[in-house]
Amino acid sequence: MPLQLKKKAGKPVLHGNAGQQQNNSPAPQQSQEQTMTQSQQPPVNSQPPSSSTNAAFGMMDVPESERHKSMSPEEYNAKLDRRELLFGAIPMLPTIPAIDKIVFDYCDGLRVFVPKAEDGNFTTYRIFMKEEQFGTIVCHDVMTNNEQKFYNTIQKYYCHFGLTIIRLVPLPDSIRDNVMKHYGLTAIEVQQIYELCQFPLVKQEQIEEDIFNKCFVLRESERPRYAHAIDELLRYVQDNHTFHHSFDPKDKEIFVQFPISTIGDSIGWFSYLERFQKKTQCKLLAVMNPAIYDLYEKQYPTIKFIEARDTRNYKPYACYNMGLFFKANTTNQPYDFRYIGNGRTVSKILDVDDTDIAPRVDLSAPRRIKEPYVCIAVNGSAYCKTWTHPTGWQEVVAHLRKIGYRVICIDKDKVAGSGVVLTHIPWGCEDETGNKTFQERINILKDCDFFIGLSSGVSWLAWCAKCPVVLISGFTNPYNEYYTPYRVINPMVCHGCWNDETCDFDHYDYMWCPKHKGTPRAYECTKNITPEHVLNVIATIPAYQKMKAKYDAEHPEKETSKYLKTEIPMPVEEKKEEVKATVTSSETISAPSQSFDNQPCINIQ
């Protein structure tokens, strides 16, 4: 509804969407558009602050109330340093020229920097920032360059932001008088003023009540008079005074930055980058940990891979941060990742199809192990990620070895944990732990009959290696990772706290269990996943069925339909080299090395 000024009982009253408001009403509250963007004064070192960004994995959790405050130079520099440590650097100031030395870019959202006019010839600008796909105005401001100003959208994920900058020129008095005479100030619509003054950009936009109040002052007289603010409203614009830019990533350099310190989820996210590049036709630069991009560099020749330390050498058109952003952050992600799941959250950040597609990896290495074998990984970065059943791994490994499988553990560490809570590789498995490259682990995974693991990075590697994955996880819901028909979860007990929006994961608490920590029900999500449950899922894997049928044919007198409850005897050569040790929180067990021919340990070069 257009806003109108009418005389009522000798005193003008404002009519509009918000009801009735008299001239002595308090100043209007901050509009929705204003709350969606930042308009901040840069610190004295001319480094403009941007919105506080929650970095991945809880390392930069910033409460919502802190996201709109101006920062001191020290605070801003510290924020940039933290961001660079996590993702890599972006230019301090935007790098794309607009008009009158105003610059912008799409690094960390749409950023616009208006420098102060040094010659004293100040100019007034109207700044529009609009998401063009949805038609949402995220910034509508009028400013004068008698001081420098920095604008930064709250939204950091992929959006079609358009930028319009209008250089305002004073309107001749004759046109102003015609406007006043035309309406007689008895019934005036702001929309009509815009149309009459040839304001093509904004004449179709809804004029909010607070904007009207800023432009008019109602006096206790028979007719309202205009104050100085109306001069701003009654100005027109010619084509050479307007700059407009719509988001256009084609053939532009765009950073997609992965958290440097995080490995697991980053492995599974890479197929979304290729989809993003095909969609935008941009020159994509993947900023990643070298340990990961060595895995993908030859598989994706159209994507350029760089390390975080090299980002200072570029001036990208746009930049997007990949990661899991905590505490209900919707600044770096359009949806809370707990609703979407770890695997698909990047598809929402980049606005691409979220179909599960495993990234391509090199699977050309020759097979090194002749016998049928199974790979396992038992360690996790938090205790809730592990399989906490007291005899789970031992019974599963014993059964698989009984029917003829070699069971190889490919964790990084033989012993992992925190304090006195330690997880060891299961007895009876072959030790292939160590600080190996991802490609070395894929070379083992690609030829195994199946992999048994947790919600961890090795499970993402197994997915890339295209082997069947038995994924044991209770603290995540099934949609959190990629789809596997061999998912093992017990929904009859507490489960899925990772994807529970009421629970914020604590990265500094290895024993995190948000609902039952310190009670007998702690970690019941995996404690109540039995070995029989896991073996029943394994029994549906075709390769296992063939192995089991072969064993049954060779041992018709033995019953193996159920999992083994007794420990199988150790071979003589293993008994000789058995090591007994007491483990403290500061020790690591190093099992004696054995040759490839003498099981159970193998050493693959």
Question: Which stretches of residues belong to each language-model region?
Answer:
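Charged, low-complexity eukaryotic segments
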Residues: 63-64
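Short, basic, low-complexity termini and linkers enriched in Ser/Thr/Gly/Pro
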Residues: 41-44
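Long, low-complexity, intrinsically disordered segments
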Residues: 2-20, 26-27, 38, 576-605
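Catalytic machinery of carbohydrate-active enzymes
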Residues: 49-51, 55-58, 74-580, 584-587, ...
